[in-house]
């Protein structure tokens, strides 16, 4: 067998296989021998007919199988010799099949993505310094107090106020409708909590144990759950228990109870260090987004169509899973959101290409900078993760293996290592100091901002 290849400009390769008549004859013989094992010919038990009789019986009907065998075996013999590796087996076309003559088969196969990496060293980055104030530490201490708080029953005659905890029974239905369920129970409801429905808790202030109150509440028009947005619901609430939330005193005992610190000052030092590291990490991650954008804009990428198509489907199905939507096709999704299918496909294609660019940019940088990731590295990262969750490493590994997530976590840790390598290579200039509040505002901004 002879073969010729020609590289195209779109990450594909033209390949032409030329088989001699003797190659084709051998492929037919191999196919006849396979068929002989199961064929049933009158006068013989299944699989026992002589090979020459099998050949006469089947004749040219096995041509398709024989040619397929010829191509598969031929490709297997040259795969390691190809200058441009094949990422998937292509569909071959037979140019002209005539028994007893040479056979020519042609195909176009996809090869690896082609990445021409732009400048990634010495990129200039401005970084703000994170300034942790006493007020920031106070806020963290207050959060710790809330975590360690205990509840105590209020005395008879006392009523509910903001900051209290209540147990209640209630019924709810849309205005003008009949209640669908019997009464519901809600225990440990924190009055005045920032995540509660705005304007709801005010209806409960001043109530005592055993008191019942009926009232209406209208959800905002822009409420996240569309099925209740802008609608009015009628509530009937009975207070079953009423507690005061007792916060611990800010002292050395608080520090010891929280994490075993030997003093309050030691805990404050830990908080200051953790806040600084956490928000520096946040800034670094946001700056890395800008760095990758600059590298990608300066690089060239050629992806095989199958890469983009498969990644586009992956992005789409991830979105369906994340938003807990029913399993639907992209066509049905386009109809559901009332958009043109081509527009939706293009949107997911763009997302897919962006993900591929990030992935292969990391791979290329890792290759050039010789970034490796060993099983020892992986175990060390898993150990840190298990420690942060306060669970044994063996339990974490068991959960990851159960969810088939080990490879995903390995890839994520490796990507993080490449990111750290890249960040070390950029030119960093530290500018003004930002408070924790300012850093939060900066991290919440979607648009790129130079600090």
UniProtKB/Swiss-Prot annotation:
Superkingdom of origin organism: Bacteria
Keywords assigned: Cell cycle, Cell division, Chaperone, Cytoplasm, Isomerase, Rotamase
Major localization listed first in the record, in broad terms: cytoplasm
Gene Ontology cellular-component terms listed: cytoplasm
Enzyme class, spelled out: isomerase
One matching Pfam family: Trigger_C
GO BP term, pick one: 'de novo' cotranslational protein folding
MF GO annotations: peptidyl-prolyl cis-trans isomerase activity; protein folding chaperone; ribosome binding
Subcellular location: Cytoplasm
Domain PPIase FKBP-type span(s) in chain numbering: 163-248
Catalytic activity: [protein]-peptidylproline (omega=180) = [protein]-peptidylproline (omega=0)
EC annotation from Swiss-Prot or TrEMBL: 5.2.1.8
Matching InterPro entries: PPIase_dom_sf (IPR046357), PPIase_FKBP_dom (IPR001179), Trig_fac (IPR005215), Trigger_fac_C (IPR008880), Trigger_fac_C_sf (IPR037041), Trigger_fac_ribosome-bd_bac (IPR008881), Trigger_fac_ribosome-bd_sf (IPR036611), Trigger_fact/SurA_dom_sf (IPR027304)
Comment on protein domains: Consists of 3 domains; the N-terminus binds the ribosome, the middle domain has PPIase activity, while the C-terminus has intrinsic chaperone activity on its own.
UniProt family annotation: Belongs to the FKBP-type PPIase family. Tig subfamily.
Function: Involved in protein export. Acts as a chaperone by maintaining the newly synthesized protein in an open conformation. Functions as a peptidyl-prolyl cis-trans isomerase.
This protein's name: Trigger factor
Organism, scientific name: Leptospira borgpetersenii serovar Hardjo-bovis (strain JB197)
Gene coding for it: tig
């Amino acid at each position: 067998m002879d073969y010729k290849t020609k590289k195209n400009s779109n990450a594909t390769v033209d390949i032409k296989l030329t088989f001699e008549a003797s190659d084709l004859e051998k492929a037919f013989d191999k196919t006849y021998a396979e068929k002989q094992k199961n064929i049933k010919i009158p006068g013989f038990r299944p699989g026992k007919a002589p090979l020459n009789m099998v050949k006469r019986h089947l004749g040219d009907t096995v041509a398709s199988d024989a040619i397929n065998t010829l191509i598969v075996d031929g490709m297997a013999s040259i795969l390691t010799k190809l200058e441009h590796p094949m990422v998937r087996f292509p569909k071959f076309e037979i140019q002209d099949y005539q028994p007893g003559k040479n056979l020519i088969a042609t195909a176009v196969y996809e090869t690896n993505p082609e990445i021409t990496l732009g400048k990634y060293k010495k990129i200039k980055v401005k970084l703000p310094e994170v300034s942790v104030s006493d007020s920031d530490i106070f806020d963290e201490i207050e959060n710790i107090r809330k975590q360690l708080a205990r509840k105590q029953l209020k005395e008879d005659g006392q009523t509910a106020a903001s900051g209290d905890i209540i147990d209640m029974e209630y019924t709810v239905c849309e205005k003008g409708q009949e209640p669908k369920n019997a009464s519901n129970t809600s225990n440990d409801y924190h009055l005045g909590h920032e995540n509660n429905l705005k304007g709801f808790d005010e209806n409960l202030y001043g109530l005592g144990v055993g008191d019942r109150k009926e009232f209406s509440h209208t959800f905002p028009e822009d409420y996240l759950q569309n099925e209740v947005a802008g609608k009015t619901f009628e509530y009937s609430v009975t207070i079953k228990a009423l507690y005061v939330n007792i916060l611990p005193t800010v002292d050395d005992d608080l520090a010891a109870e929280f994490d075993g610190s030997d003093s309050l000052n030691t805990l404050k030092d830990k908080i200051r260090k953790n806040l600084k590291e956490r928000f520096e990490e946040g800034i670094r991650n946001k700056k890395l987004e800008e760095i990758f954008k600059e590298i990608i804009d300066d690089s060239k990428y050629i992806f095989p169509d199958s890469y983009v198509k498969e990644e586009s489907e992956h992005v789409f199905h991830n979105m369906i899973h994340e938003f807990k939507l029913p399993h639907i096709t992209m066509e049905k999704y386009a109809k559901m959101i009332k958009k043109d299918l081509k527009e939706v496909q293009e949107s997911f294609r763009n997302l897919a290409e962006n993900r591929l660019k990030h992935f292969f940019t990391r791979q290329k940088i890792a290759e050039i900078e010789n970034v490796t990731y060993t099983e020892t590295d992986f175990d060390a990262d898993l150990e840190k993760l298990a420690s942060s969750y306060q669970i044994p490493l063996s339990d974490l590994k068991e959960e990851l293996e159960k969810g088939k997530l080990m490879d995903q976590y390995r890839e994520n840790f490796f990507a993080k290592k490449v990111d750290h390598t890249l960040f070390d290579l950029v030119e960093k200039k530290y500018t003004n100091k930002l408070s924790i509040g300012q850093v939060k505002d900066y991290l919440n901004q979607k648009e790129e901002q130079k600090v």
